[in-house]
UniProtKB/Swiss-Prot annotation:
<feature type="binding site">
    <location>
        <position position="203"/>
    </location>
    <ligand>
        <name>Zn(2+)</name>
    </ligand>
</feature>
<keyword id="KW-0346">Stress response</keyword>
<keyword id="KW-0479">Metal-binding</keyword>
<dbReference type="InterPro" id="IPR001915">
    <property type="entry name" value="Peptidase_M48"/>
</dbReference>
<feature type="binding site">
    <location>
        <position position="129"/>
    </location>
    <ligand>
        <name>Zn(2+)</name>
    </ligand>
</feature>
<keyword id="KW-0812">Transmembrane</keyword>
<feature type="transmembrane region" description="Helical">
    <location>
        <begin position="178"/>
        <end position="198"/>
    </location>
</feature>
<keyword id="KW-0378">Hydrolase</keyword>
<feature type="transmembrane region" description="Helical">
    <location>
        <begin position="7"/>
        <end position="26"/>
    </location>
</feature>
<keyword id="KW-0997">Cell inner membrane</keyword>
<keyword id="KW-0482">Metalloprotease</keyword>
<dbReference type="InterPro" id="IPR050083">
    <property type="entry name" value="HtpX_protease"/>
</dbReference>
<feature type="transmembrane region" description="Helical">
    <location>
        <begin position="30"/>
        <end position="49"/>
    </location>
</feature>
<keyword id="KW-0862">Zinc</keyword>
<protein>
    <recommendedName>
        <fullName>Protease HtpX</fullName>
        <ecNumber>3.4.24.-</ecNumber>
    </recommendedName>
</protein>
<keyword id="KW-0645">Protease</keyword>
<dbReference type="InterPro" id="IPR022919">
    <property type="entry name" value="Pept_M48_protease_HtpX"/>
</dbReference>
Length: 280
């Protein structure tokens, strides 16, 4: 219920932001166009954002005979929830995420690198963590916030170009360069804050929930240490291309030295591991 309310607030905020920008660009006509655009975007964010994210990462569905599907199925039955669809991302960087608007329409995606680097027990710990996100209904707000963060970044880029090429000396049309500069600075910060505020506390709850589902918190603790090390050693190219989706993953896939990772979307791995080890 709380996450549904958060989703409504995020969609309403996106609508308000677009309407304000539409007013700045085109007056009352711009506001109407922006309102229509926001309605389409909100509809798409709710119904299709999960499909879009899976396509971003070229995720392919796994068959019901794959051992990962069997693990997910067993965990779901143990937790008393619907069995999510399972997808595989062909990338050597080990990571995973869950998406979907509700438990009945959820999906879990893992990379080939995760299957190559982790033991079956560690894989079970990761899958239980992602299933906990599904049960807690984090997946809808996570994927909607990714859409909003991406939209904010796109709007910032639009203002940058308009401020550079759309302004004339009489200020009769176009966007004033100062407005463009403000949007260029504020919008990415707002996007980062949205992601950080939503995901950090939810990761702790999913860690604890996943540990209870799997029955062994040490499996996830061990997996997190391996995933953290691997993600510092190599780039996840698709994630670098789509930084607004970083908070979906169990471990932040972005390069820590980049400005795109100025705001941490995840708690520290050390703190997460310490909490898991203290559970039992």
């Amino acid at each position: 219920m709380i996450n549904n309310l958060k989703t409504f607030i995020l969609l309403a905020s996106l609508t308000a932001l677009l309407v304000v920008i539409g007013g700045l660009l085109g007056g009352s006509t711009g506001m109407l166009v922006a309102l229509l655009f926001a309605g389409i975007m909100n509809f798409s964010a709710y119904w299709y954002s999960d499909t879009l994210v899976l396509k971003m990462y070229n995720a392919e569905p796994l068959s019901n005979n794959h051992f990962v599907y069997h693990i997910v199925s067993e965990l779901a039955h143990r937790a008393g929830t619907s069995v999510p669809k399972v997808y595989l991302i062909n990338n050597s960087t080990p990571n995973a995420f869950a998406t979907g608007r509700n438990p009945e329409n959820a999906s879990i995606a893992v990379t080939t690198g995760l299957l190559d680097r982790l033991t079956q027990e560690e894989i079970t710990g990761v899958l239980a963590h992602e299933l906990a996100h599904v049960i807690h209904r984090d997946t809808l707000i996570n994927v909607v916030s990714a859409t909003i963060a991406g939209a904010i970044s796109g709007i910032a880029n639009m203002f940058m170009w308009l401020s550079m090429f759309g302004h004339n000396s009489n200020n009769e049309e176009g966007v004033h360069p100062v407005v463009g500069m403000i949007m260029m600075i504020v919008a990415p910060l707002a996007a980062g804050l949205i992601q950080m505020a939503i995901s950090r506390s939810r990761e702790f709850e999913a860690d604890a929930g996943g540990a209870r589902i799997s029955g062994n918190p040490q499996w996830l603790a061990s997996a997190l240490l391996k995933l953290d090390q691997a993600n510092h050693e190599q780039y996840f190219d698709e994630a670098e291309t789509h930084p607004a989706t970083a908070h979906l993953f169990i471990i932040n896939p972005l390069n820590g030295e980049k400005l795109a990772n100025l705001f941490s979307t995840h708690p520290s791995t050390a703190e997460r591991v310490a909490r898991l080890r203290a559970m039992y």
